[in-house]
């Protein structure tokens, strides 16, 4: 008897599109803030919007910049440092792809929850 191999369909609930770089809570907040402000945000404004410390924001921005998702422009204004962060076109595209997958997760979860809810008529029958 010959060994038959079946093609295995991709795992339905693998959600490979949930980009690990974006999925981290702080980085998701950063990208969401930046996508809502296409001209960019100053470091301190972004820090307040995301409720992060200087160090946390710096580290997460570094990860996002290395991945090509954000661009950081540093300059001086009246002898004070000015850092402006913007989402890149690549960052915008990956963020939107991430949202598509996240929306599928929500749809799947809602469908699973709805199918798991007991039918009120059946519950009454069992209780009687």
Where do the PLM segments sit?
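Charged, amphipathic alpha-helical coiled-coil/dimerization segments
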Residues: 63-114
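Short, charged, low-hydrophobicity "junction" segments
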Residues: 1-5, 40-43
């Amino acid at each position: 008897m010959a060994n038959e191999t079946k093609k295995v369909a991709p795992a339905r609930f693998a959600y490979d599109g949930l980009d690990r770089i974006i999925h981290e809570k702080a980085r998701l907040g950063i990208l969401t803030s930046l996508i809502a402000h296409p001209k960019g945000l100053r470091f301190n404004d972004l820090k307040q919007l995301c409720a992060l410390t200087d160090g946390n924001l710096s580290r997460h921005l570094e990860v996002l910049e290395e991945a090509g998702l954000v661009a950081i422009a540093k300059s001086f204004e009246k002898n004070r440092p000015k850092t402006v962060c913007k989402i890149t076109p690549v960052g915008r595209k990956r963020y939107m792809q991430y949202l598509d997958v996240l929306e599928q997760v929500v749809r799947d979860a809602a469908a699973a929850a709805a199918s798991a809810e007991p039918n009120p008529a059946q519950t009454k029958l069992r209780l009687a």
